[in-house]
Amino acid sequence: WESASRSMARLDGKVPYIISGGNHDYGYQKSENGRTKLPEYFPFERNSCWRDCLVADFPNRNGDISMENAAFEFHDKNWGDILVITTEFAPRPDVLDWARDLAGSEKFRGHKVIAMTHSYLKQRSAEYTKNTSYKITPQTSGKDFWDKFVSISPNVVLAVCGHTGKPGDFEDAVAYRVDKNTAGKNVHQMMFNVQISGGGWEGNGGDGWLRILEFMPDGKTVKVKTYSPLFGISPSTKHLAHRTGACDQFDMLIDF
């Protein structure tokens, strides 16, 4: 926790970064229960950039207010109003109700909504995750996240997650799909989890790969790129810093 906090401190006061709690952020090792140190190490007041964009929150499993279930509002001259809603790992049914009601509220129903959660899509196949084997309870699945929040919220345009993956090709660390919501609009859904790239579970921790989303000035195109600053910083490896395969770079056309 202290190491993660020190690393993220470089962004405090500079970037309104948003955290989506994962399975290893709960319990003793992997979500044996709902105990977490997220409120202790990442309180809302630690980053001054959250002051003007944090607009809503919902208590975590211990009744504490934290980054686990929170919403952030952004305004852009080309993209208009954007609301980012992040939820805890395997969110409780009440959390999905809160997220759905918030997205559909009078204040935010005209916003483009980006939904974040940890476990949502399986690697490569992009199937929705089912109920997990983790002991944390109550919990919902990726399929529930789609059925009970994303698909029935007409203004959710993008959902992003991590979590799944297996040693193998880079394609085993990513997933992408587009589905129609109940309003007939396209919803882009993307999983990115490169923790096993560069040596497997006990390897190099992902070789620094980042998934970059560039929101273009036309207000409807999002360019997706995959870049590693670890490779990019060295003249001897910078030629490896950009992945250019079909699963690494593509455009998303936002339907709103």
Question: Locations of the language-model features?
Answer:
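Extended active-site neighborhood of metal-dependent phosphoesterases/phosphodiesterases
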Residues: 1-97, 107-108, 169-191, 211-212, ...
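Residue-level recognition of alpha-helix boundary/capping or hinge positions
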Residues: 4-6, 55-62, 76, 109-112, ...
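Active-site neighborhood of phospho(di)ester-bond hydrolases with catalytic His/Asp-centered motifs
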Residues: 16-22, 87, 114-118, 137-140, ...
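Alpha-helical scaffold elements lining the catalytic groove of polysaccharide deacetylases
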Residues: 101-103
